[in-house]
UniProtKB/Swiss-Prot annotation:
Residues 1-20 are annotated as: Disordered. This is Transcriptional repressor NrdR. The keyword Phosphoprotein does not apply. GO terms for biological process: negative regulation of DNA-templated transcription. Keywords: ATP-binding, DNA-binding, Metal-binding, Nucleotide-binding, Repressor, Transcription, Transcription regulation, Zinc, Zinc-finger. Residues 49-139 form the ATP-cone domain. Signal peptide: none annotated. Pfam families: ATP-cone, Zn_ribbon_NrdR. Its cofactor is Zn(2+). HAMAP family: NrdR (MF_00440). The gene is nrdR.
Length: 161
C-alpha cells in the first residue's frame, strides 16, 4: 500500500479488525519511511461494474462517489454513519448481484432513492431533486405526492419547526 504522505511503498499493517457487520476490514497502517499513520478499508468486490451515464459514456462504478452523493442528501440529518454505511453496502450488493456487468446511472439512482426513502424522507426528496433534475416547485410536489400519508405528515411537521 502506497503511503498517502510520501508515496513510499514500504508500509506495515499495525492493526486489523472487522467492522460491526464484518463486511469490511479496517486496517491501521504506518509508513516505514516517514512514520505517517493512516487507515485503509478492505471489502469484498463480487464483480467489476460499469456505469452507463445518461450521455452513453461508460465509466467504472465508484463506490466512493455513491457514498458522497448519499452523504450530501443526508447533510444535517439525524442519521448515524453506521446506517449510511449499511445502506451503501446493501446498494452495492444489490448492484453486484443483479448479474449485469453494466448498469445505467438511472437504475442506480432509482435503487438509491428506494433505499433513501426507507432511511430518511428529507434525504429522499433532496436526492430526487438532483437525480431527477427538478426545475419547478411542481416537481417537488410530485415527489412529495409519492410519499405515503404518514411520511407526508412527518414532512409537514418538519416544515413547521
Amino acid at each position: 500500500m502506497r503511503c498517502p504522505s510520501c508515496s513510499s511503498l514500504d508500509t506495515q499493517v499495525k492493526d486489523s479488525r472487522p467492522t460491526e457487520d464484518s463486511a469490511v476490514i479496517r486496517r491501521r497502517r504506518v509508513c516505514m519511511a516517514c512514520n505517517f499513520r493512516f487507515t485503509t478499508f478492505e471489502r469484498v468486490q463480487l464483480r467489476e461494474l460499469t456505469v452507463i451515464k445518461r450521455n452513453g459514456r461508460r465509466v467504472p462504478f465508484d463506490r466512493d462517489k455513491l457514498v458522497r452523493s448519499v452523504q450530501i442528501s443526508l447533510r444535517k440529518r439525524p442519521v448515524e454513519p453506521e446506517k449510511v454505511e449499511k445502506m451503501v453496502s446493501a446498494i452495492v450488493r444489490e448492484l453486484e448481484s443483479a448479474g449485469e456487468a453494466e448498469i445505467s446511472s438511472e437504475a442506480i439512482g432509482e435503487i438509491v432513492m428506494e433505499h433513501l426513502r426507507k432511511l430518511d424522507d428529507v434525504a429522499y426528496v433532496r436526492f430526487a431533486s438532483v437525480y431527477r433534475n427538478f426545475r419547478e416547485a411542481k416537481d417537488f410536489e410530485a415527489v412529495l405526492g409519492e410519499l405515503s400519508g404518514d411520511e407526508m405528515a412527518r414532512l409537514a411537521a418538519l416544515r413547521l419547526k
